Amino acid sequence: MELMVVLGIMAILFGIAIPGLSAYIHLSQFRRNDSYAKTMYLAAESSLTYHRTGGDWEDLALDIEQQGTQSFPDDDEKQSIYALRLAPGEYGEETKSGDGALVTELLDTDIYDKSMLDAAICLEIDITSGQIYSVFYGTNCDGLYYSHENGDHVGQLCIDGDKRDYDTRKAERLGYYSVEDTANLADLK
């Protein structure tokens, strides 16, 4: 009888603890991915600064335009922003996709923990200014895509403009860091 009471109490305690622990793990994965997105942002911006000051920015911008995907094709103000993506597991491969090779080139020198590059990464770069616009970092998906792209996107996360809010990204554990988040802290109108 006493064993049944103890087992009943343990079942109740586990019933309360397991969902809380699961939510904590989910939140910690999201925060880690957000932190990694910021790290990728800073590394990519450092690399782009090196290319701009080194005089080879025009060649890199042309490569980004040819290999990348236009992030906002319907927004006239953001026509010059192109996305470069690296799929999970692609970093360790000898041959990478065109934009995956560019992501590797931009991040490889400034990222010391190379295991961070084994994720779905998207760098959005403004080819007019030569600045990084935003970075997505996901470990719980097979890739990142835009809704205007054709193809099979099973297991991938959509990264359109309306999917960038905190709650949507938290549900998917998708890390994100953007110049809009850092530059527009105060409304000066």
Task: State the predicted function of each range.
Residues 1-21:
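N-terminal single-pass transmembrane signal-anchor helix
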Residues 8, 45, 67, 75, ...:
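Compositionally biased, intrinsically disordered low-complexity segments
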Residues 8, 20, 44, 120-123:
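Small side chains
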Residues 11, 20-41:
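Aliphatic-rich helix starts adjacent to a transmembrane/signal segment
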Residues 42-70:
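Alpha-helix exit/C-cap motif
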Residues 113-189:
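Short, surface-exposed interaction loops/tails
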